[in-house]
Regions:
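Terminal amphipathic alpha-helical/low-complexity segments used for targeting or macromolecular assembly
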Residues: 1-11, 16-17, 23, 59, ...
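Structural signal for interior beta-strand "rungs" in well-ordered beta-sheet cores
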Residues: 3-193
């Protein structure tokens, strides 16, 4: 079915059942599936494909040749009804692909607000992304990955399935991430290592200078190899320390205490 409303180009194809706000703009040769919902002021440039049971929040803009809501790239997927939810004011640039979930991962892929997905980036099935995330050109996020708020991922990065990327962290270009990344950390290298605290990110979020200094001290204490304490003992010592009252320190400790399928990216030994 072709709809020719004022904001929908006559060459666009919108299937029966799609829910599209009157304020949306749909450009030439876009294809919108029957289970798609587009909230207010969503803008699609030309040749965008939105499929599956997909909700896209208000103010989100999608550039040409992106495929959003496509079936999961998972051999176990057998056609079950799963979903993709995208929040408000996201920028999805050219040739981006984002998949719906699978039954094995809860059935939902979710993305928060104010994220930027640069050209050629990919978000796999069952991923959970927070707000204010930047994923640079041609980076690929495998299935079941959790990315917390305010994360910046450089170009040509690959993130292995089931990894967790902590809040406020920064991953340098070309990294192959196969372990969890601690909040507020800076990760560099093709075989990535923890190079320190993401000072720029902390300043941007408005962290106090004295709190940043204490967080740097916590990182040093966690990964120093002096004395007889093992890593778990060092972590527990900080858990009972007055440093634990600092918001950023508390986030780091709680992240590291959670159960995970992966270990942590650590400094080079």
């Amino acid at each position: 079915m072709t709809i020719t409303l004022p904001n929908i180009h006559p060459t666009a194809i919108v299937e029966d059942g799609a829910k599209i706000s009157n304020s949306c703009k749909i450009g030439p040769y876009c294809c919108i599936g029957s289970e798609v919902t587009l909230d207010n002021n969503v803008s699609l440039e030309s040749h965008v494909v939105i499929s599956g049971k997909t909700f896209i929040g208000s103010g989100t803009k999608i550039w040409p040749f992106s495929s959003v809501g496509s079936k999961p790239q998972d051999l176990k997927y057998s056609g079950e009804k799963t979903t993709l939810t995208i929040g408000q004011n996201n920028l999805i640039r050219e040739c981006v692909s984002i998949s719906t979930g699978t039954d094995g991962g809860g059935g939902v892929t979710s993305i928060g607000d104010n994220c930027l997905f640069m050209l050629g980036s990919h978000v796999g099935h069952d991923c959970k992304l927070g707000d204010n995330i930047v994923i640079a050109n041609n980076s690929a996020i495998a299935g079941h990955v959790i990315i917390e708020d305010n994360v910046n991922i450089g170009g040509l990065v690959g993130v292995h399935q089931f990894c967790r990327i902590g809040e406020g962290s920064m991953i340098g270009a070309h990294a192959m991430v196969s372990k969890d990344i601690i909040p507020f950390s800076m990760i560099v290298g093709m075989r990535p290592v923890l190079s320190g605290v993401n000072l720029v990110g902390l300043k941007r979020r408005g962290s106090k200078k004295e709190d940043i200094k204490k967080l740097v001290d916590v990182f040093s204490r966690l990964f120093e190899r002096k004395g007889n304490q093992n890593f778990k003992e060092r972590l527990e010592a900080i858990d009972t320390d007055e440093l634990y009252q600092i918001t950023e320190v508390k986030k780091v400790i709680e992240f590291m205490k959670q159960e995970s399928a992966r270990s942590f990216v650590a400094p080079k030994t």
